[in-house]
């Protein structure tokens, strides 16, 4: 079971799922199965069965984008997002009414594919609102005088721990 973090809100793939209005940026999921790998719009996709530990391990099957897993950016880059939008938009070129085509793109499973990161370790920024038994603080930029922003970051990092801070 690979632990994954959703890195962009998604409002699809939740048919029959109770208690989840949408899949939120920061939600943790566990990979149960992955299949149907394909490349489209310059990106790599797959179909994944994932469960959500914070929602009684309810499972969904969703289209996922694999490129975000090892990307240094927080989610798809602007260029990747634009390439995805343009590619999906071309798939609906037969819809001549602009508004209807836009709606079709917004409902497309590729356009709405889950953007994921590995969640074995996450940054302080991504952890806001969550708590973990152990928190490891690695900040190589300590200075003699900390700014207000530094102190706020440190407070957030420390208060994520329920048992131990390293």
Positions of the model-derived regions?
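Core RecA-like ATPase module of SF1/SF2 helicases and allied nucleic-acid translocases
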Residues: 1-166
